[in-house]
Amino acid sequence: MQFEIRDSRPIWQQLAQQLRERIVKGDYPPGSNFPTVRELASQAGVNPNTMQRAMGQLEADGLVITNRTAGRKVTEQQDVLAEIRRTLAMQRTEDYLKDLEALGLDRAAALELLGAKGEKENE
């Protein structure tokens, strides 16, 4: 899997964000073994310490559970996954609204466009 380091935020935060998204999308299913820090660091082309910091954030979020003898697993707690999914969706919605405001649309017009798109998809 590819990682993209694309903005000015610290690298570990970007890695944690991308791993969060992969977990809630199901790339790493609930209860599944999570790759090791070294494997992920190698995939991302970063120092293992940087990836460890990202993993620490995932553990703090409750998305990944560490078992000393069995490694890391993705949480099976659906409420945790649902809350992270909702948070990510809210962040993307806010980014979308900011992008449309940069084009000169106010929030009401942006939300109207979003609603119209949703209605068109449902037809």
Annotate the PLM regions.
Residues 1-33, 39, 87-123:
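Extreme N-terminal segment that seeds HTH/winged-HTH DNA-binding domains in transcriptional regulators
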Residues 45, 55, 62:
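Active-site-proximal glycine-rich helix-loop-beta segment
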Residues 34, 63-74, 78:
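Short, Lys/Arg-rich nucleic-acid/phosphate-binding segment
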